[in-house]
Amino acid sequence: MEQQGLFGQAMGAMRGLLKVPSWDHRAVEEATRAVTLDGLKAYMAAMRRDLRCTVFGFGNVTQGDVLAMADSVAPFIGPDAGRPVEAVRILPVQGVVADYRRDSVLEDSALVEMFLDPVVGPDSRARMLLLEGLLSTRFYSRLRTEEQLGYVATSFPVMFARGAGIGFGVQSPVAGTSGLADRFESFYFKALSQLRGVSDEEFESVRQGVLASLTKTPDTLDEEFGWYETDLRLGNSAFDGLQRLTAAVDKATLGEVVRVYETLVLGPGGTRVLVQIQGSRFRDLGWADKK
């Protein structure tokens, strides 16, 4: 794991921070060393008592096929099992800053910063998709092309359960996490004036790009099933998550997108998450410190 690409490590840590509960790979490795055969047997026995099964049919299957499958797994359901649980993710809170730090044996550094909206639902998710669409080229051009900070310079929408946010990330051979954080801040302020100057035509072009991505014909069964699986995990029996998100993108306004940027990225309107992977070359330069 320590030799894995720095940006991959940072993104993996980011995904772990969005889950409840979560552990990084080091904690799992340490816990594994203490596992005994008796302990494993006790865990398996407890798991079987609470074993739950959810059967969901999708594609070329009939109702009879699904019911037959349900009957076949019914004997394995644990005596203490309740209803299937919904997927659990963190709930962003206004003004909270989370800071994950880790030294790396590799020379490069990586910084990933996320801004998570405490308002959940399709409207928030739509605004984040549109905001990322407006910022992706600008972030890459500034930090990768102009400042040449690293191999990877990217923005990305953050989608978790019913929540959403926006993230920025760089892997760099020329700056530690503190230096990268300074360049991120410089970009954030510059981007505000750029967002305020976005034309209606550019915004509509970004909107149509997002809508095209959401409504395109799936290339694989797995791609088509992904949206249904998300609804299933969240207990959305209407299975209309994609339709609701598409409708929210269609009605979102440029003013709403700019305001959410001002509130979340430049203000303390949500939860701010830093993932810092400090390369060995920059260990003496210190960490980014954001309050």
PLM features per residue range, with description:
Residues A13-G16, H25, E29-V35, G39-V73, ...:
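C-terminal regions of mature proteins
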Residues M69-R83:
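Glycine-centered hinge/linker elements that transmit conformational signals in sensory
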Residues A98-E113, R144-I166, A175-F184:
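A glycine-rich, aromatic-flanked flexible loop/lid motif
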Residues L40, V55, E113, L129, ...:
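Buried hydrophobic packing residues in well-ordered domains
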Residues H25-A31, R52-G59, D117-V120, R125-L130, ...:
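Second-shell loop/turn segments in exported
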Residues A10, R15, D80-R138:
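His/Glu-based metal-binding/catalytic segments typifying zinc-dependent metallopeptidases
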Residues Q63-A68, G121-R125, A175-D182, R283-L285:
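Short, conserved charged micro-motifs
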Residues L134, R138, R142, V158-P218:
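M16/insulysin-pitrilysin zinc metalloprotease superfamily fold
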